[in-house]
Regions:
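Bacterial Sec-dependent N-terminal signal peptides
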Residues: 1-27
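Subset of outer-membrane beta-barrel
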Residues: 23-457
Length: 457
C-alpha cells in the first residue's frame, strides 16, 4: 500500500488535532467519534496491531514460541499451558508515551488501556500428584482469555488545494474502534512434548468519518461521509513445544534431570475468514450555528461481506537452567499480503519479526533476600509493520527490560507482579518517525487449590 497522506506541515497539524481525547464537531449531532489515540496509520486494515504477549514475556523481547513457565501464561503458544503448576489469573495494563515527528515538526501523545484478562489452570493438580506419589509424565492445561487485538484512533485535518470558485477546502478525518479476541485454549503434554490449540472468536466495530468543508464560505454546507463496519468470526491458533532435558547419573544408577534443558517451539495462527457487516451514510449539515441544516443524501445498512485474516508462524529455540537462567531467540512471519476486507479494502504487506530474550534469577529459593528471588529480564525485538508510506514499509525496532516481583498470597502460593519497559522506534524515517516508551504492568495471581482432591481418613 502506498499513500501520501503526510506532507510535512499537514502532518504536524494532524498530530496536534487529536491527541488522546479528540472531541466531536460541536455543531453536529450526527457522530460521536472520540479516539483514544491519534495514530494516522490506524486508518488502514483493522487498525494498529496490539501486542498479545503478557507482561512477563514483554520484558524478554516478546518471546512467544519457546517461553513456558509454571506460574505464568503464554497464550500465543497454547502448548505452554501443559507446563502450568498452578491456576493463574492474569490481568495486564499498558501505557505508552510517543514522540511523533517528521522533518520539520513534532508532537507528544499518551495512550493506555487494559492489555489482557486471562484465567489458566492445569488439568492435573500438582498437589494431588505429589500426595498420591504419581509420576507427572503427562499433564494438560486450559485457559480462557479476552484481549484487544487492534486499535483504531485518529483525528486529522487535510487542507485541499485552492479552487478558483469555491476557495480552499478541508477534509477532517476521524476514526475509532478496534477488534477483540476471546479465546479458549487447551494443551496436552507427554514427557517433553506439548501441543495445544487456541479457538479464537474475533469481534469488533470500527467507525470512520470524513467531513468536507469549504473554509472561505462560512455559510456553505459541509458534507460528512460516515462508514461503520463490524467483524465477527472464528479462527484457530496452534502451538508445539519440545523440551529436551539433560540428565545425569543418580545415586541409584538411574538417570535424573539436571534442571538444564533445550526447548524448541513453533506457534502461529491459521488465518481464517470472518463475517463483516457495513453501514454507509452521507449527509450535509451546517458547520456554523447561524443556519441549522441537516440533510441525508444517501444511506445503506446491513452490507454483508467477508474479511480474510492472515496466517502466521513463529519458530524458536531456547536454553533454560530451570529457576536460574533462560535465553531464547525466534523468527516469525505473518502473511498480511493475503488480507482482504470487503467492508474496507486495503493493501497490506507481509511482515517478518525476530526476537531475542533472556531471564535471570539469582537465587529462586532464597528465604530472606527478596531481590535474589526477583526475575530480571531483557530482550530485543525487530519487526516489520504491515502498512507502508510512499511505498516504504514501516518498521519497529525496540529493546525491552523487565522484572518479575514474587509476592506471597494468604495461601502461601507464589504469585508475581510483572513490569516491562519497552523503548523503541517505529515508522518510516523522515516521513513518520515515532520514538516511544511503553510500560506494561501485569499481575499473575496463582492458586494450586483448584481441582485439589481432598481425602478423609
Amino acid at each position: 500500500m502506498s499513500t501520501k497522506l503526510f506532507p510535512s506541515p499537514l502532518f504536524f497539524f494532524l498530530l496536534l488535532a487529536g491527541g488522546l481525547g479528540a472531541q466531536t464537531v460541536s455543531t453536529s449531532d450526527f457522530v460521536d467519534i472520540r479516539p483514544k489515540q491519534n495514530s494516522p496509520l490506524s486508518r488502514f486494515g483493522l487498525g494498529d496491531p496490539i501486542d498479545q504477549v503478557h507482561a512477563a514475556a514483554a520484558g524478554m523481547g516478546a518471546l512467544q514460541a519457546t517461553y513456558q513457565d509454571a506460574y505464568h501464561l503464554n497464550l500465543l503458544n497454547p502448548a505452554s499451558l501443559a507446563s502450568l503448576q498452578a491456576t493463574s489469573f492474569e490481568i495486564g495494563l499498558y501505557a505508552r508515551n510517543s514522540q511523533l515527528s517528521d522533518a520539520n515538526s513534532s508532537a507528544n501523545a499518551w495512550q493506555g488501556n487494559i492489555r489482557y484478562l486471562a484465567l489458566g489452570f492445569p488439568l492435573r493438580n500438582p498437589v494431588n500428584l505429589s500426595l498420591d506419589r504419581l509420576l507427572n509424565s503427562w499433564n494438560g492445561g486450559m485457559a480462557f482469555s479476552l484481549a484487544p487485538t487492534t486499535l483504531v484512533g485518529y483525528d486529522l485535518e487535510l487542507k485541499g488545494n485552492t479552487d478558483s470558485e469555491l476557495g480552499p477546502t478541508s477534509n477532517r478525518l476521524r476514526g475509532t474502534g478496534g477488534a477483540y479476541r476471546f479465546s479458549w485454549s487447551t494443551a496436552l503434554r507427554y514427557r517433553g512434548l506439548s501441543g495445544g490449540v487456541n479457538v479464537n472468536y474475533n469481534f469488533g466495530k470500527i467507525t470512520n468519518s470524513r467531513i468536507l468543508s469549504f473554509d472561505s464560505i462560512p455559510e456553505a454546507l459541509a458534507t460528512e461521509f460516515l462508514e461503520e463496519f463490524s467483524i465477527s468470526g472464528f479462527n484457530l491458533g496452534y502451538g508445539l513445544q519440545y523440551a529436551f532435558n539433560f540428565t545425569e547419573a543418580g545415586d541409584e544408577g538411574n538417570r535424573v534431570p539436571t534442571g538444564k534443558r533445550i526447548i524448541v517451539g513453533v506457534n502461529g495462527t491459521l488465518g481464517g475468514t470472518v463475517d463483516t457487516e457495513a453501514s454507509l451514510l452521507s449527509r450535509r449539515f451546517s458547520p456554523s450555528d447561524q443556519v441549522i441544516v441537516r440533510d441525508t443524501l444517501a444511506a445503506e445498512e446491513g452490507i454483508a461481506g467477508l474479511a480474510d485474516l492472515p496466517g502466521s508462524y513463529t519458530l524458536g529455540l531456547a536454553y533454560e537452567d530451570v529457576n536460574r537462567f533462560f535465553i531464547g531467540a525466534e523468527y516469525g512471519r505473518t502473511g498480511y499480503g493475503s488480507y482482504t476486507n470487503d467492508a474496507q479494502p486495503d493493501e497490506l504487506l507481509d511482515v517478518t519479526r525476530m526476537a531475542f530474550g533472556v531471564q535471570y534469577i539469582p537465587n529462586a529459593n532464597s528465604y530472606n533476600r527478596f531481590w535474589e528471588r526477583v526475575r530480571y529480564r531483557a530482550g530485543l525485538r525487530l519487526e516489520d509493520d504491515p502498512r507502508a508510506i510512499d511505498g516504504e514499509q514501516a518498521r519497529r525496532n525496540a529493546v525491552t527490560v523487565g522484572v518479575g516481583l514474587p509476592i506471597r498470597l494468604p495461601r502461601q502460593q507464589i504469585s508475581f507482579l510483572d513490569l516491562a519497559v519497552e523503548y523503541g522506534k517505529f515508522g518510516v524515517p523522515e516521513v513518520l518517525d515515532e520514538t516511544y516508551v511503553q510500560f506494561t504492568l501485569g499481575f499473575s495471581l496463582n492458586d494450586n487449590s483448584w481441582f485439589f482432591k481432598r481425602k478423609l481418613n
